[in-house]
Amino acid sequence: MPILEAPEERLRKFKYRGKDASVRRQQRLAVSLELRKAKKDEQALKRRNITTASDPFVQQTNGAKLTLQEIIHGVNASDPEQCFQATQAARKMLSQERNPPLKLMVEAGLIPRLVQLLRSSLHPCLQFEAAWALTNIASGASELTRAVVEGGAIQPLVELLASSHMSVCEQAVWALGNIAGDGAEFRDIVISSNAIPHLLALASSNVPVTFLRNIVWTLSNLCRNKNPCPCDNAVKQMLPVLSHLLQHRDSEVLSDTCWALSYLTDGCDERIGQVVDMGVLPRLVELMTSSELNVLTPSLRTVGNIVTGTDPQTQLAIDAGLLSVLPHLLLHPRSSIQKEAAWALSNVAAGPHQHIQQLIACGALPPLVALLKNGEFKVQKEAVWTVANFTTGGTVDQLVQLVQAGVLEPLINLLDIQDTKMVIIILDVIFFILQAAEKISQKENMCLLIEGLGGIDKIEALQLHENRQVALTALSIIERYFSEEEDAGTLSALLQDHECLTPLTKT
């Protein structure tokens, strides 16, 4: 509680105190994890290829549909034409929009034969159909993807990346993307099978944009997942090409490129540094101004990840123009963008007072206060964290500017919420503001302002809160700043039989 320890000790313990970089870093990661858990990922892990007649290798066959038993018999036939007809029939069943029989095909034992057919170099149309069938099986649940991997599909699929037939090559890319998207285990098997050099060569060649989209999506899945992260050598191979792809004009290519970079920056400072060293920050900030949500979202996520890194890395993002864009994104019509922007801003506010001053100078305070007043609750929470970081790392003059921006009214209004942790944070912010006012002999004026906003009544009511930490925080504020001197011993007496409370952190 504010009154229980020296201000310097409390500031050190509070979230993101600038002098303790290791603690700040751990807590920034905790905030990042919470944000990630709170929202669904916009990028698809896996994609199933639905039947289309536009591909040159898709031959329209006539006659009755084959039964599963006929498919099993035909796929294993030695006659290439019969084998093709059966494999295509299997692929069509696996490509139907509703309830494709993925598990049924696996249980029928088709995977080993489909893997064999991937090496039918004399029959590229057969390779294509087999790769397509495996692509769709791998798009299913993890157990089905595992069946494809354990059936030995990865190595022949990687070999098909060098096929002279573009459709075969593209289908192999798609299949590998689905396998890598299942998780770190299969991602690393794809990487160890030397897929990346082939994918990068394809990405750098003059392929149609539809093909390039699949390549970039597969590369993004090779950047995806942690515990463990993709190996350093793989990242070093991919980064130059990803950096180049950021200049592409196609929104889907840009989207998946940004997603790839967002996965790479969602980790250690060293990996963030590798991305930053590619010089991509100015372009990422530029893409944050895109009107296309599928580009804006991952570019904002990537830059948001970068500012969870070191203070110099955050400064590079600021130098790239981050703070000229964030205030506008705080007012974006989509609450998901507001939340991401507020989260990014909270990490800027978690830095030294120089970063906080740049935040003020860019005009971020008015839209931040607007979010505190009118944003959805999930957005208000991120805005509260931004203010909390601001008050712990800012100078007295900066806290004065925060108050002048009107932050107290919405904070006091939020004291009624049911989120106990948020209430504690808001009470701590109010304490820091009062402490700053005391330092410049403005305690009485600040108390009058809080009283005029209805703050005293709300803080007094919180003394009876069922959560002990809320109650004691409220009591300490009332006793220190709003009570008569003869009541000053109440808090210390109350605490005699109780342990001091743990410092506030976000988990």
Curated annotation (Swiss-Prot):
SMART domains on file: ARM (SM00185)
Localization terms from the record: Nucleus
Domain of life where this protein originates: Eukaryota
Sequence ranges of the ARM repeats: 99-139, 142-181, 184-224, 227-266, 269-308, 311-350, 353-392, 396-435
Pfam families: Arm, Arm_3, IBB
Keywords: Nucleus, Protein transport, Repeat, Transport
UniProt GO cellular component terms: cytoplasm; nucleus
GO molecular function: nuclear import signal receptor activity; nuclear localization sequence binding
Chief localization: nucleus
Domain IBB: start-end pairs: 1-57
Gene Ontology biological process terms, A to Z: NLS-bearing protein import into nucleus
Known function: Functions in nuclear protein import.
Family to which the UniProt record says this protein belongs: Belongs to the importin alpha family.
Record's subunit section: Binds to importin subunit beta-1/KPNB1 via the IBB domain; this complex dissociates in the presence of RAN-GTP. Shows a limited binding to the RB1 nuclear localization signal (NLS), but not to the SV40, nor NPM1 NLSs. Interacts with RSL1D1.
Designated name of the protein: Importin subunit alpha-8
Originating organism: Sus scrofa
